[in-house]
Design a protein with these regions (language model features):
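Conserved active-site loop/cleft motifs that coordinate metal ions or position small ligands
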Residues: 255-258, 289-294
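A short, acidic, flexible beta-alpha connecting loop/helix-capping segment that sits on the rim
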Residues: 295-299
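C-terminal motif of bacterial Sec signal peptides marking the signal peptidase cleavage site
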Residues: 17-21
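Feature marks hydrolase-like catalytic cores characterized by long aromatic- and Gly/Pro-rich stretches
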Residues: 31-33, 283-289, 327-331
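Short, low-complexity, polybasic intrinsically disordered segments
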Residues: 268-289
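Chitinase-like catalytic core of GlcNAc-active glycosidases
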Residues: 23-211, 215-242, 251-255, 261-275, ...
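Bacterial N-terminal signal peptides that target proteins for export
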Residues: 1-9
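Hydrophobic helical h-region of N-terminal Sec-dependent signal peptides
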Residues: 10-15
Length: 331
């Protein structure tokens, strides 16, 4: 998933599931506290670490994925969006406001833009320290690693990251780790599977594998909701094999993240109907959480539905009311 600052662009079991089956800008949307729900599927949108929007609280998120922490250049210093220090007062204030509803905050490292810290830190100890600084700054015990593009294909950084996360979990018992990975309707690719295997080799305790059901390819011109479900089913089979999980546990260790409205690939548009479809499926399968990229885009563009194919960073590109996607995902 893209940075908010990017210009518009054309054999360890799942830790949380070990007991259940492991075999080896305001736009007028008001704040709302998380609502009680019998569903095991929570709503956890991606939000900007630096900029608030009136749609942040729509859908009553249980958790906010705070995006993104990356390197500020070529060193091992973690920065919000690659620009702001961990002690930035405005970011700290923002985190505090997000928590007022009772929601938790998950720190998301990586993303599609900038340099993920595993590509700039020299060793596992330094990398673990960098990750830890970000978690401490946010007061969080939840870490998400959004690994994609060239970074996902970089086996050296994949190995280093796994070793650093394992080290960090030993230092911080109870640290929840999720991996956010690109997926196709056919499932995770070889690089995504290799990352999960690396996590296994280094005894990383993985809570959730979050699938980015978005931006497939120009040949995928069908229904984006259907594609999301197809991708989830394919990845479900893969997760069972990688982690040695039961059917139920593999679903419960999965999350789904959609790019709302116009995607970066021309012809791919994720609609409100698709969001409702994904939410229903997630509840049926007891998937851990659903998410979207992003709250900042959960509004109609000022000029309505643009004719251009590019996805905007600050609106969805489809006809909607502010926060409409969040309300669908929130259930």
């Amino acid at each position: 998933m893209r940075s908010y600052l990017t210009p518009v662009a054309g054999l360890t079991c799942l830790f949380a599931l070990a007991a259940t089956g492991c075999s080896s800008m305001s736009d007028g949307t008001s704040d709302a506290a998380p609502k009680a729900s019998e569903s095991s599927t929570s709503y956890a949108p991606y939000v900007s670490a630096t900029t608030a929007t009136g749609t942040d609280s729509a859908g009553s998120p249980a958790t906010y994925n705070l995006a993104f922490v990356i390197s500020g250049g070529s060193d091992c210093t973690p920065r919000w969006d690659g620009m702001f220090g961990m002690d930035d007062a405005e970011v700290k204030s923002r985190i505090g406001k997000l928590r007022k509803s009772g929601a938790t905050v998950r720190v998301s490292f990586g993303g599609a833009s900038g340099k993920e810290l595993a590509t700039t830190c020299g060793n596992a100890s330094a990398l673990a320290d960098a990750y830890g600084k970000a978690l401490d700054a946010a007061g969080s015990t939840q870490a998400d690693f959004d690994i994609e593009g060239r970074t996902l294909a970089d086996s050296a950084s994949v190995d280093l990251r796994s070793r650093a996360i394992a080290r960090l979990q030993k230092q911080r018992p109870g640290l929840e780790v999720s991996f956010t990975l690109p997926v196709m309707p056919s499932g995770l690719d070889s690089h995504g599977l290799a990352l999960l295997e690396s996590a296994n080799v280094h005894d990383v305790q993985v809570s959730t594998v979050n699938l980015m059901t978005m931006n497939y390819a120009e040949s995928y011109t069908g229904d984006m909701g259907d594609y999301a479900l197809t991708a989830a089913k394919a990845a479900h089979t893969q997760l069972k094999k990688v982690f040695g999980l039961s059917n139920a546990a593999a679903w419960e260790g999965m999350a789904l993240t959609s790019m709302i409205g116009a995607n970066d690939i021309a012809g791919e548009t994720f609609t409100l109907e698709d969001a409702a479809q994904v939410r229903s499926f997630a509840e049926e399968k007891r998937i851990a959480w659903v998410s979207m990229w992003s709250t900042f885009r959960d509004r109609q563009c000022e000029k309505g539905v643009p004719s251009r194919a590019d996805a905007a960073t600050d609106c969805s590109g489809v006809k909607q009311k502010p926060g409409a996607f969040a309300r669908e995902f929130g259930g």
